[in-house]
């Protein structure tokens, strides 16, 4: 029996975390949490003692005594864990480091401009109070952007800072950064990172929310320019080619 889970799919929202969670859930050596997003480390009433950790294990994996079997790797997927504070600091990763400094992080990335619009569309579809996307872009890219869910849409695309925070706290050997193209064909990278055998996966249906309108060219151009320095930094830290995400 071990006392800590092994890995987290820590981000990013609207980058394929549902799909990756479902794919890994098919692996015989892996036990993924149910529900997918436990929101343990970002809870407002967070408590980081051993009793709370056992409750976390029971809630996520249905383990009666909170114990984790050594024969399996345990993982969960809460994209909010990589969320940034107003100064770019990690809001929740420090809690995770205290829980398990050896935990591994898998983080997915897609074009940050498309990711932002997808998140805004999801909030709107779910009936959350959200302003129009042009206002999100205008305010979210300003120097004093508020930290509400409407405006952290923009800061979630600060990929360079997100990677810097993870690397500083956990080191490169515990971080797997993936630019998503086709997850089914990228799973060997994930299994190699986790140290488990490769396998064939069954593709499961993933619902994509419809868009009522296309993103305006003005908003797109503003975000391309805004994210440019972050994408350069992201590429330098990860070795991932993000040239096509930069202002063009």
Name each model feature, range by range:
Residues 77-85, 140-155, 206-221:
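Surface-exposed cleft-lining segments at the edges of enzyme active sites
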Residues 86-106:
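ATP-dependent NMP and nucleoside kinases share a basic, alpha-helical "lid"
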Residues 41-51, 81-89, 154, 181-185:
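Acidic-and-aromatic substrate-binding clefts and catalytic sites of carbohydrate-active enzymes
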Residues 35-36, 154, 160-233, 239-248:
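The conserved 3'-phosphoadenosine-5'-phosphosulfate
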Residues 99-119, 181, 186:
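Conserved phosphate-donor/acceptor-positioning beta-strand/loop module used by diverse small-molecule
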């Amino acid at each position: 029996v071990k006392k800590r889970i092994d890995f987290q799919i820590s981000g990013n929202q609207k980058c394929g975390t549902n799909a990756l969670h479902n794919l890994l859930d098919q692996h015989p050596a892996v036990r993924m949490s149910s529900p997918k997003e436990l929101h343990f480390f970002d809870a407002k009433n967070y408590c980081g003692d051993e009793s709370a950790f056992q409750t976390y294990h029971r809630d996520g994996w249905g383990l009666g005594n909170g114990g984790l079997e050594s024969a399996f790797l345990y993982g969960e997927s809460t994209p909010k864990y990589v969320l940034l504070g107003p100064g770019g600091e990690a809001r929740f990763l420090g809690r995770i480091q205290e829980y398990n400094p050896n935990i591994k992080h898998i983080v997915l990335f897609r074009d940050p401009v498309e990711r932002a619009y997808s998140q805004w569309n999801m909030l709107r579809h779910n009936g959350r109070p959200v302003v129009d996307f042009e206002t999100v872009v205008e305010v979210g890219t300003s120097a004093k952007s508020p930290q509400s869910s409407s405006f952290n849409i923009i800061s979630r695309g600060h990929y360079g800072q997100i990677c810097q925070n993870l690397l500083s706290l956990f080191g490169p050997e515990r971080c797997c950064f993936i630019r998503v193209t086709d997850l089914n064909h990228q799973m060997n990278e994930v299994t190699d990172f986790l140290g488990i055998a490769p396998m064939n996966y069954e593709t499961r249906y993933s619902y994509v929310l419809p868009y009522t309108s296309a993103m305006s060219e003005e908003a797109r151009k503003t975000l391309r320019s805004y994210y440019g320095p972050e994408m350069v930094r992201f590429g330098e830290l990860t070795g991932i080619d993000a040239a096509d995400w930069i202002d063009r």
